[in-house]
């Protein structure tokens, strides 16, 4: 229903993805290569096909019903006026009864009742089973939603449908930290497992509770830049990225986070549109601009997460009809745009900018049929630019985005720079210069300047005396460039970057 986020069996591999034997082989082969495998952990909700929920439906007053949130309706209406993340009411009527069950996502994804201790213990047993197999950790999905306000109060409607966003109920709940600590102590902590939380709706003052030495997780994703294009009502009124706000937001997050620990830095993921289309101005949506965006992201303080296709510069697809989409959220946003008075063309354009399916089109391996992804029919169509943007072509081109990413990551992890880029401070620079994204990475031994021109005009940068040599620049991406720099200023053309020591 939701591309794998509706779990019907927590102890099995979905048939379309392979077998448990193949997964065990993956773990073994990864270990030989000193690599680690983490998996998605979806424990806010399960599938309506799960054995627990099927038993709950048969007896809405029985033991398994308490694994979920079954509530009586009010005056013939649902228990409260929450809108699910995918649109429509959060409450689904149980046929033949006066009860409803809660689903903050799709109706096929009933929320699990984390107030039930027996359920929690079953989840902990399942998590430890995977860790015992040799898994190194988890990306933990939608985890802050596990704590509900059990009064389920109504909120002021925020749209024409008379409903209120369900996250308002989550924000009104208290005590999620206690549940997360119990989760950690019963599972991850025992195995020294790596965890990265997908956390929205966290209060800023709660950051030290979520990351750092004693945090609930090893790290959490930094979604601060993604939130800049959140519309008040949906995708149809999502604002375009403003460079000054983007720069201020990212650097501000860096300064706040370093007080407590590390965040996981992203440009894109499976729930977001492609970063090259979202964050780069039109004049920079090219290989040079994509390398520039990758540079300023990968060299930030924190853990860089590189999503499939990002390393070759994949972009948003061109969608001709709402029927071409598979994503449930996209179809809901299309309906919301139409309901708000937009034309079909305008609604489709809004989805084209923001749809999650932009990041879910098949990986572009080659210029062969289906971009070399499969000989079968893929879930989604292939981006029509696959003949120009694909792995096979970029493998052969030393100046490609792919080979640049390899060089960038290798330098970040090199013996010379790994301490600096792991633990060094991030200090904003040239914040008053139009179009310039710049910062220093600094520790007791080294100081590196990263500077990029996102503008459409050349910019003059006045350098301080600490800049001695250029390590990498737009013009020098094939070899390690270690040449002396003796000039007091730097002339940076549009869509260019430098990395200086």
Regions found by a protein language model. Name each.
Residues 1-128, 132, 145-205, 210-212, ...:
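Acidic/aromatic-lined carbohydrate-recognition and catalytic surfaces
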Residues 24, 29-30, 303-306, 312, ...:
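Carbohydrate-interacting/catalytic domains
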Residues 35, 134-136, 193, 217, ...:
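The start of beta-strands in P-loop NTPase/AAA+ ATPase cores
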Residues 110-120, 167-172, 275-288, 349-350, ...:
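Active-site rim elements
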Residues 122-129, 133, 292, 296, ...:
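A non-catalytic, amphipathic alpha-helix used as a structural packing/dimerization or gating element
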